[in-house]
Amino acid sequence: DSGFDCSGLVGYVFRTALGIELPRVSREMATKADAELIKDRDELQQGDLVFFGRKGRVNHVGIYVGEGRFVHSPSTGKDVRVDSLVSGYWGGRFMQARRVAM
């Protein structure tokens, strides 16, 4: 397979568009100390990192694009897509968000 996994896509976007280096894996991105923790979905802003998982463990990351939606790579080799943050598969798996200082 070629392409991006979820954290690879997020890292690529932040590195190439903003010159910001992020940790390589989603779990480490979710604990990035210099990124503001956002717990309430209503507080999200475009560009925030959104994290998903189960049983308290982060296993997926995307970038919030507004209007309750986020862009992400479902898995390596799959097309990058935009999905709902509030309904469907991802709605029940949202855990937190982080706002990276730009």
Model-derived features with residue positions:
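Conserved hydrophobic/aromatic beta-strand scaffold that supports enzyme active sites
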Residues: 49, 61-63
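Aromatic- and glycine-rich peptidoglycan recognition patches
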Residues: 36-40, 58, 65-102
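Structural motif
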Residues: 47-48, 68
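Catalytic cysteine-centered active-site loop
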Residues: 1-46
